[in-house]
């Protein structure tokens, strides 16, 4: 089953510009290869206040996403030290 990707507006505006180009390409390849095919296999479910969300580890970066039917909603692509705080803020 193929999954469609949808990105939170802040991913393009805030997250991606701060990531070096070579890492951006690596992240794009991982997201495209893993999250569009088997996100529940490659991702790890989050716990606590972020229960219902998943993470994909790509080096020191984390891609936080939510599964909604055949859609993968990407909330953040940030360094592991700041990603969970940013996701909590984006969720309001």
Label every PLM stretch briefly:
Residues 32-57, 85:
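A short, surface-exposed loop/turn module that caps and links secondary-structure elements
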Residues 10, 51, 82:
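Residue-level recognition of oxygen-bearing side chains
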Residues 2-6, 25, 58, 66-92:
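Enriched for short, Lys/Arg-rich terminal
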Residues 1-29:
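Arg/Lys-rich, positively charged N-terminal/basic patches that mediate binding to nucleic acids
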Residues 20-24, 40, 77:
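Alpha-helix boundary/capping and short turn/kink residues
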Residues 27, 35, 46, 75-78:
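Generic leucine side-chain signal with a strong bias for well-ordered alpha-helical environments
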